[in-house]
Amino acid sequence: MKVVDMHCDTIGELLADHLKGGTMSILENPLHIDLKKMKKGDYLLQNFGLFVHLEKVKDPFAYAMKMVDTFYTELEAYPDQIGIVKTWEDLEKNMAEGRMSAMLTLEEGGMCLGETALLRDFYRLGARMMTLTWNFQNQLGYPNRMELHEGESYPRFLPDTEHGLTEKGIEFVQEMERLGMIIDISHLNDAGIWDVLKFTKKPFVASHSNARHL
């Protein structure tokens, strides 16, 4: 069975390693995803998310651009194994040539600094999907509420049904829809998700989210 994986953080981990002088490669590494693991797992497509931690990075856009460079540098080194896709036709071509496919995606709309021009720049560079938020409020919207209980090391997320998309967030989802960039609602709060439904017409995805009920 062919595998399509909607999200991984491999590129950011490779960049962090390289900035420390490391030599980890997309071909083989101790992370969850590398080309050898993908080939063994019969992968069709891997989405490579570029994640920026807004509270730890001074210039989110500049850091994201470093990850874009890492994405292309790593994957273009193995053209016989994997090809970068921007369209459905690219995916079909890779399938016909026996190659796996990679798609560039963005995790944290705040890396666009509230500027649709930067969103379009990411699209021109090949990004085809983006989450509007991560775990922090940004120019576009809000995550669900976090509560850290005594004795627990990881916060619990509680539904936020009050704070929808900002005006800038609405502008972004409409521009993403115009461009053909997939809206990813993972990490977005409940009110924001309802606004995505209200202000867009095309399908959207939740790339790495769990269902509350089955």
Predicted regions and their residues:
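Histidine/acidic residue-rich metal-binding segments in metalloenzymes
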Residues: 114-124, 149-205
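Short, catalytically relevant binding-site loops at active-site mouths
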Residues: 190-191, 211-213
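Active-site metal-binding loops of divalent metal-dependent hydrolases
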Residues: 8, 188, 209
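N-terminal hydrophobic targeting/anchoring segments and the immediately downstream early-domain regions
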Residues: 1-154, 158-159, 212-214
